[in-house]
Amino acid sequence: MTNCVPLSFVQSCVGHRGAARFFHSRLYKNRLDKDVYLCNNLINAYLETGDSVSARKVFDEMPLRNCVSWACIVSGYSRNGEHKEALVFLRDMVKEGIFSNQYAFVSVLRACQEIGSVGILFGRQIHGLMFKLSYAVDAVVSNVLISMYWKCIGSVGYALCAFGDIEVKNSVSWNSIISVYSQAGDQRSAFRIFSSMQYDGSRPTEYTFGSLVTTACSLTEPDVRLLEQIMCTIQKSGLLTDLFVGSGLVSAFAKSGSLSYARKVFNQMETRNAVTLNGLMVGLVRQKWGEEATKLFMDMNSMIDVSPESYVILLSSFPEYSLAEEVGLKKGREVHGHVITTGLVDFMVGIGNGLVNMYAKCGSIADARRVFYFMTDKDSVSWNSMITGLDQNGCFIEAVERYKSMRRHDILPGSFTLISSLSSCASLKWAKLGQQIHGESLKLGIDLNVSVSNALMTLYAETGYLNECRKIFSSMPEHDQVSWNSIIGALARSERSLPEAVVCFLNAQRAGQKLNRITFSSVLSAVSSLSFGELGKQIHGLALKNNIADEATTENALIACYGKCGEMDGCEKIFSRMAERRDNVTWNSMISGYIHNELLAKALDLVWFMLQTGQRLDSFMYATVLSAFASVATLERGMEVHACSVRACLESDVVVGSALVDMYSKCGRLDYALRFFNTMPVRNSYSWNSMISGYARHGQGEEALKLFETMKLDGQTPPDHVTFVGVLSACSHAGLLEEGFKHFESMSDSYGLAPRIEHFSCMADVLGRAGELDKLEDFIEKMPMKPNVLIWRTVLGACCRANGRKAELGKKAAEMLFQLEPENAVNYVLLGNMYAAGGRWEDLVKARKKMKDADVKKEAGYSWVTMKDGVHMFVAGDKSHPDADVIYKKLKELNRKMRDAGYVPQTGFALYDLEQENKEEILSYHSEKLAVAFVLAAQRSSTLPIRIMKNLRVCGDCHSAFKYISKIEGRQIILRDSNRFHHFQDGACSCSDFW
């Protein structure tokens, strides 16, 4: 038979369908189609060409079949991906008991391995049969068993059992089990087996060391010391110059960041290939050594055949150039030209992807778009590179549109694509689209790994969906550092979830999570908002323990925390240690701390120090300082800071401009605020809101509403919740009841803004000031949320102004206030005022007794004026001022002139059941009257407006007296109390007596 059909001819048919058919015809012609050996070769030849039908026909027509016949048909079908048919052959083979030698077992087990998890059922049965036939101890067969158990079901235990049954283990046996432990990430067991291998006398091969190197690199942070030990062992074995081993070591050292060792191995290698080059280049790029990676490529380009992957890595090096981004971009364009010339860009999708990625990272998004557009073939990486590049370059809308286009092309998004798309949605605050992407990913069965889940948490946190953020975090099987930072940061940004943020931080600690500066910054932000000073100190201690207390980000967060908790000594200690690390955030935090703790002199000293030492104040710092001066109505200091902002060329900045509008309106210079507002080149919501609130605060409700209409017509800035607080306040101060309800209803009807508690408070004030107490009571009962302290205090104040009418409603409001704020003296004073206004002196005595029993002290009322020589402060009946005699003399003169003009003291505001004469005397010495008398006595010939600030609300008698004084003296008086501004001129007030 062999003379008719030479063996060499039989072997030449493998892989050639035509030759196989010719061979088949020769068998028929020579009547050799029943020969088992030749038929087995024919089956193998057909299967090698993928012709399973012809192979099956030959197999079925064989009168006799041996184990090789079955092995050929099973392994061939499995190799061609026809696993179900291979499974059927396996069953038939087992039934017929065709197992004549160990080589048949090898073929069958490999087929089981290729079939996968289904084939493992038969693999186990065959394993059992091997025990009966004593083949389980054979190294060749058991080596395949080890591989099958690991690749099919990932079972280290079964693989180890198969390894243990081998009587005489060869190097393949040892390499197989070491490879299993390496892939399983069990570093200790892999090296324990390696030690046993050496003890057994087996010589390690290049594959042994390859697995060990892989094991050392499988850790999250590769063990450099372990790699060094492996390298020493490899040197002793003489395999360091081996191409496979050397390339693996270079890649391993490069991945671990130990580039000195990577270069050392690279230089010692006798031969190198593209894999070796790529491994070292990847390490250089990871360390952001773009120039070195480029130089290495240029040096090796003429010595080895570089692969297309080498060009992809080279392109990734250009964005990492340390000198200038433009240099890297220029080099990238040169390589782009080279790959076009060589034609690589036309048939290598990877190079096109590398070009898109390179241009995007170098900031040339237009070039990235161009490359992407002209790519004939695009895979998921192409789309991901483009979407990620758009997101990183701030083209968020286009990134989202590219994602939609990608889905229209039926390309499934990968993890990186989802992360970039969700990031763009978060930047755009497009929660709905983000939810759609989330839902589609779940529907498609895409694995939402830790990184994607983190991106989802960021999206929901940025768009205010805190509950969704919590759900994502809870559903994650594992959390990394970013996960904890995301949830803690999201909770810390929500006022209602601040305690939860602290609890979450503690849980992260208990879970053994490594904490970084972002974690500490977030939790310190929550602690500072809660004013938990002691907890802040404990977290400071943890930061020291974690060796990150000296990082600028952490120190800035600590300064902000200590400042808000009133621990300025702690702030100053940290600030003094940061001499070389201070940035704008540091200075801002320190100044804000001083301002928060009412240390305005120190805040201003720090500002002047910054200016003298050449520090540049940014817009937010100016805004912070201006806001502080606005809160205490220090006009002169505010104007000084304004001058500094002009010198710094920041006057036109929208943040500074808005702060200036707010400062001038709060300091009584509404004319300056309006003038500056009108000259602003750009306005944001803060600008409009400050001006509208300024009008409302100064009693110019009509002007506030006109400006609101202008804002709507402008169309650039939609009204927000703060805008409507100003609008409703304007209606309240101007007594515009119908207008108030119209704007209140328009919030939800026209702008989709759900009214908040502060808006309900404004409406309660509108009704209260209009004297509509019955409607006010009905309004409160129908509120969708429980009234808070501000609303009940508004109700009580309205009852005070009603001269005792609806006293029961006022009493109810007072009782609610005593429950909510039992230690606030204002609540007791308001109740007393209500009883006094109605002449209910016995109830007034009871209210004062209740206040005394609660050990609550009333805040002293005081007024102050700013003169050239400083600030002068006055309290009621005070005679400690150096010019007290002059002041009281002037006051008597004013009282006489006012009486002559028709002034009658409103003794109801004396709040005591005293004789009429005593009440009048008490009213005469209120702090604001002392202040105005002082200014009039000190500035006899001046015609400038008199500006007086008061910490409490002005009483009705002083309000009446100031109208008379303004007319008698011919001076405008501007009084700012705790509620609003009053402009007195020619016997009238800007509030039209509606206050």
UniProtKB/Swiss-Prot annotation:
Q: Which InterPro entries match?
A: DYW_dom, E_motif, Eplus_motif, Pentatricopeptide_rpt, PPR_At4g14850-like_plant, TPR-like_helical_dom_sf
| Stretches the record annotates as Type E(+) motif | 869-899
Q: Which GO terms describe its molecular function?
A: RNA binding; zinc ion binding
- Does the entry feature the keyword Hydrolase, yes or no? no
PPR repeat ranges? 35-65, 66-100, 101-137, 138-169, 170-204, 205-241, 242-276, 278-303, 307-342, 348-378, 379-413, 414-448, 449-483, 484-515, 516-550, 551-581, 583-617, 618-652, 653-683, 684-718, 720-750, 756-786
Gene Ontology BP term (one): RNA modification
* Domain of life of the native organism: Eukaryota
Keywords, comma-separated and alphabetical? Repeat
Q: Name one Pfam family in it.
A: E_motif
Positions of the UniProt region annotated as Type DYW motif: 900-995
Which segments carry the region annotation Type E motif?
Answer: 791-868
Which PANTHER family does the record match to this protein?
Answer: OS07G0578800 PROTEIN-RELATED (PTHR24015), PENTATRICOPEPTIDE REPEAT-CONTAINING PROTEIN-RELATED (PTHR24015:SF2034)
Q: What is this protein called?
A: Putative pentatricopeptide repeat-containing protein At5g09950
User: From which organism does this entry originate?
Assistant: Arabidopsis thaliana
Biological classification of the source: Eukaryota, Viridiplantae, Streptophyta, Embryophyta, Tracheophyta
